[in-house]
C-alpha cells in the first residue's frame, strides 16, 4: 500500500470542513479590510527564499525542500508565503510607482522538520500582505484584522509586540549585542550559527539555557532612533485606543530575517503549551532585497493547522447539516432526482440513488451527518407527500411535496 509521506496528510470530511471554516472566516475579515485574493506558485527559485528569509534562518539552514530541476534550476517548495507575494509585486513592476496593493493568500507551505502536534512538513497558512503604505496605522490595522479573526473563531489569544528598528538604529544595536554575546559562553549550536550570520536571531532561541544567558542582553527599545521610537509609541497608542491589549516583548524578533520596525505575535495557550498561532510585522527592506525599488510592506501569516487543533478541542465540528433525500422503491428515483435538483438551489442535499428499507436509509443519513431526512415510499407517492424527519430533534411528519420548500 502506498501511504502519504511522513509529515503530510489528507484533509477529509470533518477536517476539510474545519479547514474551510477557518479559511472562509479569514477571507471574510480580510475582504472587509479591503484585501483581495492572490495565488502564487508552490515552486519558486531557491534564491528567492535565501535572499528574503535569510541565510541565518532555520528555514534556509535546514528546513527547505530544495532540489535541482531537469533544466538545472535550483528550486524549492515554498516554505512561507510572503516572499512569493513580494516577488509577484516586483515582477508586475508595481514597486516602480509604489502602488498600494493589499492581498491575502492561503495554501500549502513546506518545511522539512520533525512532525509534531500542530506542525507538519506540508502545512497551510493564511496570510495578508500590504504594499506601498508607510503609515504605522497600517501596522495597527493588520493587527486589528487578526484580532477580529480570532474573535470570530472564538479563540483566546495574547498579543506581543516589539520594534526591531530601521537599518540605522539596528546597526548600532547589533554592535552592542555582538559585544554582549561574545562575553558569554555555552550557546547552543543554532545560536552559534546565528551569532555569525545575524546575531539578533539569538534572541529568538527557545533553549532555556540560551534564554538564561541573554536575560540581561541590551534592549532593542533603548536603542531605537527617534523616528522608530515615535512609530513604536504611536502603534501602542493606536492599539490601546482601539481596545487591543498587548505586551511589549523585547526578545520578540520573529524567525525570519526580513522584518524591521513593527513585529508582533498572537499567542494561545489553548493548544497546550503557549504557542504562536499567528505573527507578522513590517518588512520595508524586503522589496529592495529582491531587486525591487525600496518601498513599504507589512503583513502576517497564520498557521491553519494550529487554529484547527484549537477549534477541534473547543467545538463540535460534527454539527449536523444538509438534507438526505431517498426513496424506498426504484420507481421513485426519478422523482427524488428532480426534487434534489430543485432543493439544491438553496440547500445542501445528499441524494441516494438506491432503493432501500427505511432503517438502512436512516443509517446512511446518520453517517452523512445530515440534519433533515426526506424519504418517499408508496404511501407518500400516492398522497403526493414526503416523509420528513429532523435528525437533531427527532421530529417527524409527512409533508405535501408542493409545500416542502416552505417547511424546510
Swiss-Prot record:
Catalytic activities: tRNA(His) + L-histidine + ATP = L-histidyl-tRNA(His) + AMP + diphosphate + H(+)
Database matches in InterPro entries: aa-tRNA-synth_II, aa-tRNA-synth_II/BPL/LPL, Anticodon-bd, Anticodon-bd_dom_sf, His-tRNA-ligase, HisRS-like_core, HisRS/HisZ
GO biological process terms on file: histidyl-tRNA aminoacylation
Keywords, sorted A to Z: Aminoacyl-tRNA synthetase, ATP-binding, Cytoplasm, Ligase, Nucleotide-binding, Protein biosynthesis
CDD domains: HisRS-like_core
GO molecular function, one term: ATP binding
One Gene Ontology cellular component: cytoplasm
PANTHER family the UniProt entry points to: HISTIDINE--TRNA LIGASE, MITOCHONDRIAL-RELATED, HISTIDYL-TRNA SYNTHETASE
Family the UniProt entry places it in: Belongs to the class-II aminoacyl-tRNA synthetase family.
Protein name: Histidine--tRNA ligase
Amino acid at each position: 500500500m502506498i501511504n502519504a509521506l511522513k509529515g503530510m496528510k489528507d484533509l477529509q470530511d470533518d477536517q476539510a470542513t474545519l479547514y474551510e471554516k477557518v479559511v472562509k472566516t479569514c477571507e471574510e475579515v480580510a475582504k472587509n479590510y479591503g484585501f483581495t485574493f492572490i495565488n502564487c506558485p508552490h515552486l519558486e527559485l531557491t534564491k528567492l527564499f535565501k535572499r528574503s528569509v535569510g541565510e541565518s534562518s532555520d528555514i534556509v539552514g535546514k528546513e527547505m525542500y530544495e532540489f535541482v530541476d531537469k533544466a538545472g534550476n535550483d528550486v524549492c517548495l515554498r516554505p512561507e508565503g510572503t516572499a512569493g507575494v513580494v516577488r509577484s509585486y516586483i515582477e508586475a513592476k508595481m514597486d516602480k510607482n509604489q502602488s498600494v496593493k493589499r492581498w491575502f493568500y492561503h495554501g500549502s507551505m513546506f518545511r522539512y522538520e520533525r512532525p509534531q502536534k500542530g506542525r507538519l512538513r506540508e502545512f497551510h497558512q493564511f496570510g495578508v500582505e500590504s504594499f506601498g503604505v508607510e503609515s504605522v496605522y497600517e501596522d495597527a490595522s493588520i493587527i486589528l484584522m487578526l484580532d477580529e479573526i480570532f474573535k470570530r473563531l472564538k479563540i483566546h489569544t495574547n498579543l506581543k509586540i516589539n520594534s526591531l528598528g530601521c537599518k540605522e538604529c539596528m546597526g548600532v544595536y547589533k554592535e552592542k549585542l555582538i559585544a554582549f554575546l561574545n562575553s558569554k559562553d555555552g550557546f547552543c549550536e543554532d545560536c552559534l550559527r546565528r551569532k555569525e550570520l545575524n546575531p539578533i536571531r539569538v534572541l529568538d532561541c527557545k533553549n532555556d539555557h540560551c534564554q538564561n544567558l541573554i536575560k540581561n542582553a541590551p534592549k532593542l527599545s533603548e536603542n531605537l532612533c527617534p523616528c522608530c521610537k515615535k512609530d513604536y509609541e504611536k502603534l501602542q497608542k493606536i492599539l490601546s485606543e482601539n481596545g487591543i491589549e498587548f505586551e511589549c516583548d523585547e526578545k520578540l524578533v520573529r524567525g525570519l530575517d526580513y522584518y524591521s520596525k513593527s513585529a508582533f505575535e498572537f499567542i494561545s495557550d489553548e493548544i497546550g503549551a503557549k504557542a504562536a498561532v499567528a505573527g507578522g510585522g513590517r518588512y520595508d527592506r524586503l522589496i529592495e532585497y529582491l531587486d525591487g525599488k525600496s518601498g513599504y510592506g507589512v503583513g502576517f501569516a497564520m498557521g491553519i493547522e494550529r487554529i484547527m487543533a484549537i477549534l477541534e478541542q473547543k467545538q463540535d465540528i460534527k454539527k449536523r447539516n444538509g438534507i438526505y433525500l431517498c426513496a424506498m422503491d426504484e420507481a421513485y428515483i426519478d422523482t427524488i432526482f428532480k426534487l434534489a435538483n430543485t432543493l439544491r438551489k438553496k440547500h445542501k442535499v445528499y441524494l441516494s440513488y438506491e432503493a432501500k428499507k427505511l432503517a438502512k436509509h436512516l443509517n446512511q443519513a446518520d453517517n452523512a451527518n445530515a440534519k433533515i431526512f426526506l424519504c418517499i415510499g408508496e404511501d407518500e407517492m400516492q398522497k403526493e407527500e414526503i416523509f420528513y424527519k429532523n435528525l437533531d430533534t427527532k421530529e417527524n411528519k409527512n409533508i405535501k411535496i408542493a409545500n416542502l420548500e416552505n417547511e424546510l
